[in-house]
Amino acid sequence: MALVTCNFTSPSPSSGGSDLRRWNQIIRNQVLKGNVELAIHSYIDMQKLGFSADNYTFPLLLKAAGNASSLRIGLTLHGQTVKTGFCYHLFVQTALLKLYSSLGLFLNARKVFDKMPVRDAVAWNSMLYVYTSCGQMDNAMEIFDTMPSRDLSSFNIMISGFAGAQSVTSARNIFDRIPEKDVVSWNSMILACMNAGETAEARTLFEAMPERNVITWNTMVMGYLNNQLYTKAIDLFYRMKAGDIKPDYLTLTGTLSACSHLGSLETGVNIHIYAEKLKQASSPHVVTALIDMYAKCGSIHNSLAVFYKSKTKDIYCWNALISGLALHGFGYAALKLFNQMTVNCIKPDDITFIGVLSACSHAGLVKEGCEMFDSMKRDFGITPKAEHYGCVVDLLSRAEHFDSAFQLIERMPFEPGESVLGALLSACVIHQDLEAGEKAMELVVKRDWCLSDGEYMMFSNLHASCGQWEEAERWRNMMNDSGIVKTAGCSEIQVNGRFHKFLAGELGVE
């Protein structure tokens, strides 16, 4: 931690307790402002001047450690509370509990909790929170059942925990036991339903709520988005827009993502105009969502316009545009943007390389793609994942470098998954290379005898592309005998502001 110069007059130790209170106030102000380093350095300066921390100082410092997610600082402070005897004070014990809760260290938190001679509501709820945030719902339920008294926060923490565990029945049991529910209770229960895929029940709760806040609407919009009900997400956004509660950046990003999935440029443009009106269009989250939406809706020039207009570009903005350029086959432009990104001292991450490698694959830039793959670990310290190997296998296979693709698969530090083998098989079908295709089929069967409908169809199509009709029919029959049904294709179009869904084989519209 770098030395920080503090612009304040240091209290004198000869002044006594009043100046200790001044030190505590200085530290408190710095913690509230998020100046964790200043808070810690003030504590160090305070000790150098002969002041000792008390049961008010340590909770402030422990809060600073929690805000910085610094286990090292937290453990050091915990050790000092033990040495000074303040570890037995309720304020300090509660602060330690909150620290370990924020860091997800439920064993450390439980040790502190068990040693507390007196536990207030904050202590009980902190212990509940640490268990629920770590997914330890059985332990959380044990604490909940043994609590001498429960407040509304206790119930809400439990509902949120069960929501994260996708246990909607348990969440509902807690929800129904609440004497007086607040908006947090309802929001948490809606989240539990959405996480479990029970969107109709979530909507019923939403309509029954006595009051809603922006989090309520966002929970519904994101819930629909995560359950692939994109039209419902957009419809709800327009209903929210017509009401008293204004959408925030989360609402806008969620709805723009729904537009991306639907390919609805018209709706996306309308939301962009509305975001400008709300003065939210310059938010990095919204900028990223706009870049992604325009690219996936076929308007890459608008993606570029949004990107270059933005004054603040984080890693997500760069990644969104690189992926967008890849989607449109602009390989050299994606590589140029990658270089521009590094010149601007933006460090690429694993998502960046997925975009760049995908761009090289779509543009047929074999040499450049292989060089980028090699540079991941060498120049940026990023270990390639299955998705990166999948991109390079796709790159090599598209260019008919099947020997190199198989060699890369053999060198992989893990078993090839569906994304890797799927890319290989798909290229074999396109290039009608039966020899490479049969070798790829062996790898798929070796990996898992439970083939997907897509893999059965690719095996069949491979033989059909080479004129082996009987073998193609045999694979289709094997799929039918296994009880696997090919997933029907689905399309949605927007007509006069309304979305209509078409399923393959259907005559009507939804």
Predicted ranges, named:
Residues 1-123, 129-151, 156-510:
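Terminal (and in a subset, N-terminal) low-complexity or junction segments at the ends
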